[in-house]
Regions:
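Substrate-binding clefts and catalytic carboxylate motifs of secreted carbohydrate-active enzymes
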Residues: 1-99
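Flexible loop/turn segments at secondary-structure boundaries
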Residues: 32-37, 113, 206-208
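Beta-strand-rich binding/interaction modules
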Residues: 82-120, 131-134, 145-154
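Short, flexible loop/turn segments at beta-strand junctions in immunoglobulin-like
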Residues: 138-140
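Short, exposed coil/turn segments at beta-strand boundaries within extracellular/luminal domains
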Residues: 155-161
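Low-complexity, Pro/Ser/Thr- and charge-rich linker/hinge segments at domain boundaries
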Residues: 162-183
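Conserved small/polar residues in nucleotide/adenosyl-binding loops
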Residues: 220
Length: 220
């Protein structure tokens, strides 16, 4: 999907910008290729128009002359942990920025601000510029939640953001597990007609390897 493509480009570009000794990157075309066959893999269509799933403004949050970055050790956390991640900057603007104001914020899916902070940092023309650490105890997150961590550089008029997921460390007991089956037989159909929950897991070997059976074996 287009959103997955955007996330993949974001991850690749940010990885390049976090690389010490970074000397630039090249994207092999950004629009769909219509000649000698068709490759509908571009961020833009063959006429260099938007496709509707990402805007130039969003794309520039992670592909720009000044980009805030975070080194996340993981994107899924438990609420008995403390989010502690370093903030970095990649700055390749026309000149260095003196006393840049770097503002971070953590919010939930409702847009409610949970925490915020700031750093002041001189930004030379370079990457891997350390700004400081974001530290936030996740103990107040009682239900499975998606949080957004954003970092803004005021003087560069650019901000970047990432989604993380927080789950309770103590799992609730499941009162009644679903019925687990490997085939859709009469017994399964009877349970479904009664309103019961059924988890259908295909048995290893039930699908040919070339049809995805090799992946099925890995799952089991």
């Amino acid at each position: 999907s287009g959103r997955l493509q955007t996330l993949c480009y974001k991850a690749d570009i940010e990885a390049a910008l976090r690389t010490p000794g970074f000397a630039g990157f090249q994207l092999l075309d950004l629009h769909d290729f219509p000649g000698q066959g068709t490759a509908l893999v571009g961020v833009l269509d063959p006429f260099w128009d938007e496709k509707g799933y990402v805007t130039p403004k969003e794309y520039s949050t992670f592909c720009n002359k000044t980009v805030p970055l975070i080194r996340f050790p993981k994107m899924v956390w438990l609420n008995n942990e403390t989010l502690n991640v370093p903030v970095e900057l990649a700055h390749f603007g026309e000149k260095a920025l003196q006393g840049a104001n770097i503002i971070w914020k953590i919010s939930n899916q409702s847009g409610e601000k949970l925490a915020q902070g700031s750093f002041v940092k001189d930004l030379p023309i370079a990457n891997c510029i350390p700004a400081g650490n974001i530290e936030y105890a996740l103990s107040g997150i009682e239900e499975p939640s998606q949080l957004t961590v954003s970092v803004e550089v005021k003087e560069a008029n650019n901000s970047n953001r990432w989604n993380i997921w927080v789950y309770p460390a103590k799992q609730k007991a499941v009162e009644k597990l679903p019925y687990i089956a490997s085939t859709l037989d009469d017994q399964v159909m009877n349970r479904l007609e009664k309103g019961e929950n059924v988890l259908l897991l295909l048995a290893p070997g039930s699908i040919l390897p070339e049809k995805g059976g090799d992946i099925l074996s890995l799952i089991h």
